[in-house]
């Protein structure tokens, strides 16, 4: 990639292509697909999302033991969360697309190769995370297919209610297994996108903050400039910071409620899967299948917490850069402007979910402890039922 031509939105191209396939990002009305996109969206979402959700939910309601309830809940709750996330993306789509213009505006403000290299490194990191999640989900789907193939009796990848008799006939079983696996592959694509797009946006915000910190730290050094020129440069940097804050607040509005639900959903999934694996009577392939699901769900939340801390970390670097610039030799007006920027930089860029819960590694640790507490409670219920 040419270092002189940096486009931050390149990291988002695959995400929005997948969202278009998912039926929530319509193309132009002049195209054939655009004119029929509404019908396509309805067919796709009913077939691959609503039907599979109904199957999971009915199977959950038909649970007749704590073990089967836990096995069903650990797939029903995350899938419900993904559907809510998809609805949220559709609701906030216009605002998220408009943020691309702000990213391109920040790209134009890059002043040297070092800053461009920072942005390129962020794009490469986001693409690496996307590829890694894709490989993890692919391994999970492949393992599920192996589990189906190796099973001694007709079974599906995850516990599902099917409204017809699919166990007694080989042809009915094969058709059902193929349909079910295809639907889960479509949902795996959805999970890939919904798991990685928040991290991509957060990484882009963090690297642009880092590039701005580099620009600010160089203020006042090098060849002397007139006071008016220095003030104009600083005003430009303040505007850049305001754009970054707008991006961050836009992300917070887009992710807040779904992230709050994600913490709860992941904790429940961890608790129920661990209970099923520890106390359920399962074979090795079924054990591995559910274990991979546990790893995927936990990694998704871990990734969100990790990337949510990046803007906060780079915000602290920007604060340090404000102190590091050569402000002593500048005019009084310059110092006043710098104090305004300093005051705003002192407010940390902490992403908050559900108004009160910060998205951070500390919250992730609390979630793990909560899952362990619920697992202990389920174990006590199991012991009581056995007595």
Curated annotation (Swiss-Prot):
It is a multi-pass membrane protein. Keywords: Cell membrane, Membrane, Olfaction, Receptor, Sensory transduction, Transducer, Transmembrane, Transmembrane helix. One of its GO terms (cellular component) is plasma membrane. The chain crosses the membrane at residues 41-61, 72-92, 128-148, 172-192, 255-275, 286-306, 337-357. It is found in: Cell membrane. PANTHER family: ODORANT RECEPTOR, ODORANT RECEPTOR 19A-RELATED. The atypical heteromeric and topological design of the odorant receptors appears to be an insect-specific solution for odor recognition, making the OR/Orco complex an attractive target for the development of highly selective insect repellents to disrupt olfactory-mediated host-seeking behaviors of insect disease vectors. Odor-evoked OR currents are independent of known G-protein-coupled second messenger pathways. This is Odorant receptor 19a. The gene is Or19a.
